[in-house]
């Protein structure tokens, strides 16, 4: 609430349960509102907060796909309860996985990303660790990233 108030008001005032501001202007006001991205995984507090307030949910695949879908659905239900369009919240997914080193690993990685896109993931944060050469990075671009982008 505070950030959006500061981005839209010449004389921002906000009184919340834990924080308040008065006259904390942050000129110049942005011409395009920056999206609010919240990374959360907790079903009691974090995910409902994402549904109420966030433009983007940064998630990760802890556990299995069914558990992740349950968490996505909590975000969507919370958005609906807050009077928001659940589909308006973009989903970002952090993936920690080594770069593919073979054609078959690349094909599997691309299929995995396509499947996640079908589950409404629109952004990926990819952590490949520390590649020792550019070869696996170039393989990823050519065999995974470009085909997936072409498909969607």
Predicted segments, located by residue:
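Active-site-adjacent structural elements that line small-molecule/cofactor binding pockets in enzymes
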Residues: 1-152
């Amino acid at each position: 609430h505070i950030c959006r108030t500061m981005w839209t008001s010449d004389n921002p005032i906000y009184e919340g349960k834990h924080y308040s501001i008065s006259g904390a202007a942050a000129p110049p006001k942005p011409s395009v509102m920056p999206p609010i991205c919240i990374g959360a995984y907790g079903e009691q507090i974090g995910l409902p907060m994402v549904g109420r307030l966030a433009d983007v949910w940064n998630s990760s695949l802890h556990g299995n796909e069914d558990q992740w879908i349950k968490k996505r659905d909590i975000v969507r239900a919370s958005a609906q309860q807050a009077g928001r369009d659940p589909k308006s919240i973009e989903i970002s997914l952090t993936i920690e996985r080594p770069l593919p080193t073979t054609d078959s690993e690349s094909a599997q990685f691309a299929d995995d990303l396509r499947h996640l896109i079908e589950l409404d993931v629109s952004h990926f944060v990819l952590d490949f660790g520390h590649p020792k050469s550019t070869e696996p990075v170039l393989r990823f671009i050519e065999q995974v990233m470009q085909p997936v982008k072409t498909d969607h």
